[in-house]
């Protein structure tokens, strides 16, 4: 099958990373897949580093007939069977193709409400299938926007269980940053932006430090929207007097090594998050997790069994959960062990891809059947003109 992915995002994060991994998996599995992204985006640079086939194309505007035509031309030349879109701009650009018969799917990877109900039009009438990251998204779309349940498929994110595993050296990253094995490391991995909750975690770190002055927090990820957000977080760290206890590492490719070094992973997201990849990575790496109640986190974490779950925007609750893991090694070990078992049962990347591919293949086959029926349908006979009689 030939699949074209479009990603209009200017920033690089978990969704964009996963899209590239999916494309690479498809190409390695005998299919053909490509990514169209904006030439000015971080996605282009990072995708090329991952070896993903990329086509630069301006995706800055929702409505651009020339770009829609260029997408159609690419599909025609490369015999694309289905288009996969991930956000509003790329979806609207592909709407003309869908209306002309090309199968189009729309991923929904965030839990933010659509706002006005008329924004559901593109989901209701502009795609063959919605692929949601979490059940909470499907529930919202059915109840709030009246979208038919059968139009929504829920397939959560997953990870490479070979890459993310407990086998990595726990001292590799610690040696790099000069932290001994006895120093607790609390890791937060994700883009620096308001919905990820880094400010809440900085406040939680301040509270934790009152009881555990040796605790170190490691923030991994780049800021979206330029460097200003990173500066705000650095200022918050400075105001809290945590410069010696917080490391901001920027974007890193060696996440498995950082997870191996961490005593725990904290997901402090306030909203938006649907299916946190870092939760899967941490579970697969055998790390205990503290997470806020966002997206599919409550569907996965059983409090006190395979992790600790707290309410969003509650720095005190975050701090309490962190201190609980630091003070109760048996609890942390039990949660890590149960999380690892859960990951091996539910977070296999190959299994996720086969589920997504089954959805895509079904849509492609349905499209082909419609095309065959359309071509086979007999043309209605043309009525003979009435004879014109002379006066």
Regions found by a protein language model. Give the residues of each.
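Acidic donor-binding loop of glycosyltransferase active sites
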Residues: 260-274, 287-288
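A conserved, positively charged/aromatic
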Residues: 99-133, 145-146
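Carbohydrate-associated surface elements
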Residues: 136, 158
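Nucleotide-activated donor-binding/catalytic signature segment of Leloir-type glycosyltransferases, i.e.
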Residues: 230-250
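Short hydrophobic beta-strand element within catalytic cores of glycosyltransferases
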Residues: 35-37, 288-291, 301
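Glycosyltransferase donor-sugar binding loop
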Residues: 36-42, 189, 216-232
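A conserved mid-protein helix/loop that constitutes part of the nucleotide-sugar donor-binding site
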Residues: 13-21, 184, 188-207, 217, ...
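Conserved acidic donor-binding segment of nucleotide-sugar-dependent glycosyltransferases
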Residues: 303-304, 308-315, 324-330
């Amino acid at each position: 099958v030939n699949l074209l992915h479009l990603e209009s995002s200017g920033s690089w994060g978990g969704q964009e990373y996963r899209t590239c991994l999916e494309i690479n998996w498809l190409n390695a599995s005998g299919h053909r897949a490509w990514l169209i992204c904006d030439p000015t985006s971080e996605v282009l640079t990072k995708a090329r580093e991952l070896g993903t086939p990329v086509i630069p194309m301006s995706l800055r505007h929702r409505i651009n007939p020339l770009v829609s035509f260029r997408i159609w031309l690419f599909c025609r030349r490369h015999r694309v069977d289905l288009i996969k879109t991930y956000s509003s701009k790329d979806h609207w650009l592909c709407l003309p193709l869908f209306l002309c018969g090309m199968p189009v799917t729309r991923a929904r990877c965030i839990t933010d409400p659509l706002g006005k109900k008329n924004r559901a039009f593109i989901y209701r009438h502009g795609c063959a299938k919605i692929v949601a990251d979490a059940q909470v998204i499907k529930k919202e779309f059915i109840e709030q926007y009246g979208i038919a349940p059968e139009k929504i498929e829920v397939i959560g994110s997953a990870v490479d269980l070979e890459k993310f595993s407990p086998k990595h050296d726990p001292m590799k990253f610690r040696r790099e940053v000069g932290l001994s094995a006895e120093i607790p490391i609390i890791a937060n991995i994700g883009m620096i932006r308001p919905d990820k909750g880094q400010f809440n975690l900085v406040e939680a770190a301040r509270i934790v430090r009152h009881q555990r002055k040796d605790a170190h927090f490691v923030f991994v990820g780049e800021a979206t929207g330029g460097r200003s957000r990173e500066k705000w977080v650095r200022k918050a760290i400075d105001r809290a007097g945590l410069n010696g206890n917080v490391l901001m590492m920027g974007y890193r490719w060696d996440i498995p090594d950082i997870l191996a070094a961490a005593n725990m992973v904290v997901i402090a997201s306030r909203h938006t998050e649907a299916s946190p990849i870092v939760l899967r990575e941490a579970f697969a790496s055998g790390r205990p997790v503290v997470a806020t109640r966002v997206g599919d986190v409550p569907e996965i974490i059983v409090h006190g069994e395979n992790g600790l779950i707290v309410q969003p925007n509650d720095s005190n609750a975050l701090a309490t959960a962190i201190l609980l893991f630091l003070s109760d090694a048996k609890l942390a070990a039990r949660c890590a062990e149960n999380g690892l078992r859960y990951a091996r049962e539910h977070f296999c990347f190959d299994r996720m891809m086969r589920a997504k591919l089954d959805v895509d293949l079904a849509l492609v086959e349905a499209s082909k059947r419609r095309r065959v029926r359309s071509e086979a349908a007999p043309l209605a006979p043309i009525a003979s003109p009435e004879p014109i009689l002379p006066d």
